Design a protein with these regions (language model features):
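FIC/Doc superfamily catalytic core
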Residues: 1-249
């Protein structure tokens, strides 16, 4: 059920990006367009997909309401465990699913007998998701995002490399998405410069916390695209973008 809803969200992302990007072909990147970040979309194309989401949500609510307390907790535990492990897999990182399940169960107050104790990193990743899904009514602030980022990188490093943790990325080196061998690199995307991030994130957070009359699925899709476009952190942007999406869903 969750996979189907996320598939629809990604379809919405494609529709929004296509509509936005084709408005001004003179801009190299989406954030350089003159009307950034005023997103537009095609209601006719989205209405069917959003209707499918509501149908799936209705079925899910119906099934959950028919479950007893223990089965409902078990279903929530299974869903969160899968969501957390799959999000990390997207980044090429394989988490120990038993440790993830153990940490999620502990945060939910569910018996963890027979499960291994989660290590510091796994517990940090779980804390990130639990804060988003359990405290979804709280405002999203720069401090909250910094806490999420710190939970992802408790050692202050990404692999072997020291990174800026719990703060926006810094330095003059551009944040680029590149492919190709050394000397034949192709730049596919370049994010806003680091000195532009505080301004860009203020725009983003003001919009996120504004009580707009907008479908939560659509808001989740826009927020995901907007956040990864800014790419405000040295690392972990994809995982935090998906966590923001979960916050709205």
């Amino acid at each position: 059920m969750r996979i189907s809803i996320n598939y629809v969200v990604m379809s919405v992302l494609i529709i929004i990006f296509t509509a936005k990007y084709t408005e001004n072909m003179n801009a190299i990147y989406i954030w350089q367009q003159t009307d950034w970040p005023n997103f537009t979309w095609d209601d006719a194309k989205l209405s069917y997909k959003l209707g499918k989401v509501r149908g799936l949500q209705g079925k899910l609510v119906g099934k959950m309401s028919a479950l007893g307390f223990d089965l409902k907790n078990s279903a929530i535990l299974d869903t969160l465990t899968a969501d957390i492990t799959k999000s990390s897999e997207i980044e090429g990182e394989i988490l120990n699913s038993d440790q993830v399940r153990s940490s999620v169960a502990r945060h939910l107050g569910i018996e963890t007998e027979g499960l291994p104790e989660a290590d510091r990193y796994v517990d940090g990743v779980v804390q990130l998701m639990m804060d988003a899904t359990q405290n979804y009514m709280k405002p999203l602030t720069d401090e909250r995002l910094f806490n999420w980022h710190a939970a992802l990188f408790p050692t202050g490093r990404s692999g072997m490399y020291k990174i800026t943790v719990a703060d926006w990325r810094q330095g003059v080196e551009p944040m680029q998405v590149i492919s190709g061998a050394m000397g034949k690199e192709k730049v596919h995307y370049q994010a806003p410069d680091s000195d532009n991030i505080p301004f860009q994130m203020k725009l983003f957070l003001d919009w996120v916390n504004d009580d707009q009359k907008i479908d939560p699925v659509l808001k989740a899709a826009i927020a995901h695209l907007w956040f990864v476009t800014i790419h405000p952190f040295d690392d972990g942007n994809g995982r935090i973008a998906r966590t923001i999406m979960d916050l709205f869903l």
